[in-house]
A protein has these predicted regions:
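Gly/Ser/Thr/Pro-rich low-complexity, intrinsically disordered segments
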Residues: 1-266
Length: 266
């Protein structure tokens, strides 16, 4: 089996899988707590680590159910901002063209891209609706940053073509919003290195104290040239080494339908 390392660093749970690993989206399509879906998926696919997936909204009936009840919402009431591509070829979710995805081909090659995850790119599995942290070695963050002063440089939006060689950080509005939240906010994400090692990092909501920039930079510190954040706050959960390191909030467990599983291969 590919070597797996776990450590706790500055309130961050860090799992690194060296060597081959398989991306397995976790999808709930019934009416049960998502933690039950995760545990069943983990047992069936022998997943090494599991975290939550993309941002999502709820239908009006889903909001009412979540507000007044303590039972799981029907999966149809959850409106995921992004797609999950299963190994069967099934595609679940909704369009989120401004978000990013992480995907994998059958030969274990990893990819990250912007836009909707689709079936026609040759991907075997994937998960969309994610926030970019670093893409092809370029940091994403709150505002465009450049290596030197440039006249008329754009601080947000698409940099001028002549300025792109000097770009050291690319603005992303979702990232900017997340970076302005309290440092105790839950955070989770997945990244990969040029040699296809996988890094999963998570901070429990209300417990940690790590800024969003530090969270991003920890992926880079561990060699990732591509990494994305999942839905944060009390949506974040982490399953590893036989159980949950921490769980999402009760109302999120009742409404979540997408997660990410990674299996270290033999």
């Amino acid at each position: 089996m590919s070597p797996v390392e776990y450590k706790k660093e500055n309130d961050l749970h860090i799992i690194k899988i060296t060597g081959k690993s398989r991306l397995t989206p976790i999808v709930r399509d019934g009416e049960e707590l998502f933690s039950a879906t995760v545990q069943r998926a983990q047992s069936k696919a022998k997943l090494t680590v599991c975290i939550n997936g993309c941002w999502y909204g709820l239908t009006d009936s889903g909001k009412a159910d979540a507000f007044v009840g303590h039972d799981p919402d029907p999966s149809a009431d959850t409106l995921n901002e992004g797609f999950a591509l299963l190994g069967t070829g099934a595609l679940h979710g909704h369009s989120a063209p401004n978000m990013f995805y992480i995907a994998q081909k059958l030969d274990y090659t990893w990819f990250m891209g912007q836009g909707d995850l689709t079936k026609n790119r040759g991907y075997y599995t994937g998960i969309g609706g994610l926030c970019p942290l670093v893409f092809k070695g370029l940091k994403y963050g709150d505002g465009n940053l450049y290596s030197k002063e440039l006249p008329n440089a754009k601080l947000t939006g698409e940099p001028l073509p002549a300025h792109k060689p000097f770009l050291t950080q690319r603005n992303n509005n979702r990232y900017a919003a997340l970076s302005r939240l309290d440092n105790r906010t839950g955070r989770g994400g997945i990244g990969f290195t040029p040699t296809a090692d996988i890094v999963v990092i998570a901070q429990e909501h209300g417990v940690g104290s790590v800024s969003f920039d530090t969270f991003r930079d920890t992926f880079i510190k561990h060699g990732c040239t591509n990494a994305c954040a999942v839905d944060g706050s009390d949506s974040v959960f982490l399953w590893y080494d036989g159980g949950f390191k921490f769980m999402s909030a009760e109302n999120k467990d009742e409404t979540q339908t997408f997660g990410i599983g990674i299996r270290a291969e033999t």
